[in-house]
Amino acid sequence: MAQKIASKLLWQQDDSWRLRLDTLQLPDGRTTQKGAIEHPGAVVLVPLRPSANGPEVLMLRQYRHVLDQTILELPAGTRGWEEDWLACAQRELREETGHRAEKFTELGQIWPAPGISDELMQLYLAEALTPAPLPGDEDEMIELVPMPLDELVTMAWNGRLQDAKSIIGILRTAHHLAQK
């Protein structure tokens, strides 16, 4: 017999998450409590464009307060609770990179932290980019960093790229392109 959720208590909420305290019924009859974060989901984008040295990806350098450091990562963003996945991808691409894409290819979904959150991330390869900026979030300090895909694949394998969603997005993109 597996654990099952006996009750869920909504503890706190925001526009983009809900914090719950769940009571779990264990197989032996005991109960335990665990925190859980409900999340509407997010998109992860691999904006790819041609360059003289092969395909390059529009990466971001962004400060992440939880880590208290600036990291290199793919553009990504939280969707609204009822927002369409592709509409979210189109919006986030314009907000974070200042570009729109004529072609989006789904690269699958991932659960980035299933031990604490139900957040689901949808990965997209975004191609045929043209400038089309939208204002971004006021609290985001983002630097756009175009980088060769080959270099990013190496960084994903050697540990210099540490953001999990970015590692997965880069490796899935490289695999997708190799299958063409």
Give names to the regions the model predicted:
Residues E73, L123, P146:
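Short aromatic/basic micro-patch
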Residues P50, R100-A113:
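Acidic/glycine-rich phosphate/pyrophosphate-binding loops and surrounding catalytic core
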Residues L10-D14, H65, I110-M121:
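Acidic pyrophosphate-coordinating catalytic loop
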Residues A2, I37, V46, N53-R91, ...:
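Conserved Nudix-box catalytic region and its N-terminal flanking loop in Nudix hydrolases
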Residues R20-D28, A113-A132:
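Active-site-adjacent beta-strand/loop module that shapes the phosphate/pyrophosphate-binding cleft
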